[in-house]
């Protein structure tokens, strides 16, 4: 069960597969929000804290296999610490938290990608986050072939998830689109469009809320 949204800040998350342009849009959105005079905390999962950086190194760069349930628990541990020490305090101060990946990533990557029970992964994530849901989740959607081409042009080395087979990434994308059937929280954006068009659509959705 989620906690009611009765906080002074605004919690925005960016989701989508690898190579869809989350970091680019996060940077543009941060610049726009700062221009409006809002205090912004830009962060990410995993890796938004010192502890999270260590967990990120394990889940993305450790050699060898990690059991799917162990992987899900590591992400949940990162989330619990990150929400308690970074996200909630910022929201309580009335700031905008702009975050690259959150619990929907766990449902898509560990639930669908790793073929775990998506409902259990979601409940684990909500427990770790004490029920905290974003005010808006921006899902950047892009077909896997284009996303992989973008990623390949920007990387010399793939992390553990990026290196998974195409079937894995197809399951992840399908899971994201299924999650986005929650229209009050999600904005689904066609990430094949020009960067500035995408940024304008995101700003339009936020107009009046910031």
Curated annotation (Swiss-Prot):
Species of origin: Leifsonia xyli subsp. xyli (strain CTCB07)
Uppermost EC category: transferase
Residues reported in the UniProt entry to bind ATP: 16-23
Family to which the UniProt record says this protein belongs: Belongs to the thymidylate kinase family.
Enzyme Commission no: 2.7.4.9
UniProt GO cellular component terms: cytosol
Protein name per UniProt: Thymidylate kinase
Keywords for the protein's UniProt record, in alphabetical order: ATP-binding, Kinase, Nucleotide biosynthesis, Nucleotide-binding, Transferase
Lineage: Bacteria, Bacillati, Actinomycetota, Actinomycetes, Micrococcales
Parts of the chain that traverse the membrane: none
Catalytic reactions of this protein: dTMP + ATP = dTDP + ADP
InterPro entries linked to this entry: P-loop_NTPase, Thymidylate_kin-like_dom, Thymidylate_kinase
Gene Ontology biological process terms from the UniProt entry: dTDP biosynthetic process; dTTP biosynthetic process; dUDP biosynthetic process
GO molecular function: ATP binding; dTMP kinase activity
Purpose of the protein: Phosphorylation of dTMP to form dTDP in both de novo and salvage pathways of dTTP synthesis.
